[in-house]
Each structure stands twice: as structure tokens, then as C-alpha cells.
Amino acid sequence: MKLLLDSVVLIDHFNGIAAATSYLSAHRPDAAVSVITRAEVLTGFERRAARKAARFLDCFPTLGIDQATADLAAVLRRKHGWRLPDAFQAAIARLHGLRLVTRNSRDFQPQRHRFVVIPYRL
């Protein structure tokens, strides 16, 4: 595992964005999702489609939130002013030594946050 997928990349995939699908296909063996990502992605689907999306998400290891993650997320939120889900994503990535794969370059500027990967732009 080398990468933590942010929800925006998976949502792009489900919305038919070819760049997202190509990236996921090329990096699937190295990628994981967080419980935050899973919840954010599945929220966008109706029940039947959510089951299909969940099966796709099941292809990736799912990383949870523990006390150390919560503590680091609080520090990162104070320091950077991130929304709590973004702070949790960053904390999970950092504690597991993963790169955070996102399209959210507004909050996660790769030149400022070296653990961030912006795989494509729309």
C-alpha cells in the first residue's frame, strides 16, 4: 500500500471521468481508501447503486480512525484550517506513510504538502 484515495477521485471514476478511471486501473494494487472516503462516496448513491459501488470499494483495503488519527487530525485542522474530513484524510495518510491522491488542490497544495498527489486536472 502506497496511496490513499480521496473521495473526489473515486467520485470522478463513478461519474465517467476517464482520467480517474485510468489512474485507478494503473494504481489499484497500491491503493487504499479510508472509512471517510467510503462514507463520502456511498452517500452519493441510491441503495441499489450503492451496493455496486460498495463492491468496487471492497477491492481496496479500508483504513479506519483510531485515537492517534483523531489526535493528529485535530492538530492538522487547527494548523491548516481544513474541514474535519480533510484533516482525517491527511492524518490517515501521514500515519500510514501513504501519499494522498486527490484533485483537491485548493486545500492540499502538493508544493506545500509533499504527501499529496494530484493525478489529473479537469
Q: Residue ranges of each PLM-predicted region?
A:
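Generic structural signal for small/hydrophobic residues in well-ordered secondary structure
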Residues: 6-7, 41, 73, 93, ...
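Donor nucleotide-sugar recognition loop
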Residues: 79-85
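Acidic, PIN/NYN-like endoribonuclease modules and their adjacent C-terminal/linker elements
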Residues: 90, 94-122
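Short, well-structured N-terminal submotif of metal-dependent ribonuclease cores
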Residues: 1-33, 42-58, 122
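Acidic catalytic patch
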Residues: 39, 59-79
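Alpha-helix capping/helix-boundary segments
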Residues: 9-10, 37, 69, 88-89, ...
